[in-house]
Amino acid sequence: MKYFFALLITLFFTMPAWAVDVSMGSGGNLVFEPDEITISAGETVHFINEALPPHNIIVEARPDLSREALLFAPGETQDVVFADAGDYEFFCGPHQGAGMTGVIHVQ
């Protein structure tokens, strides 16, 4: 029993941080869904390309968080870890003018 408890404690502290999924181009629309989320510092946002055309993630205030490589195929993903608290506006480079924008609130 002592070893089982130790194993549970170890697993609890080694579990990865939660990830929040954000769809890109869902339903063929030029949108992020959801386009506004709130997460805790250290959490991962998992961006998923749901449809053509290509998309990317630009965080203008923090270029180090941007994922400028284009995701061409449905199902391609990019992960971004937000370590610092703040509000992060982001957009898809090719589709910003069409309104493909969002904001991530990190607490």
Describe each region flagged by the PLM.
Residues 17-107:
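Extracytoplasmic copper-binding redox domains, predominantly the cupredoxin/blue-copper superfamily
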Residues 1-4:
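Positively charged n-region of N-terminal signal peptides that target proteins for export
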Residues 6-7, 17:
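Cleavable N-terminal signal peptides
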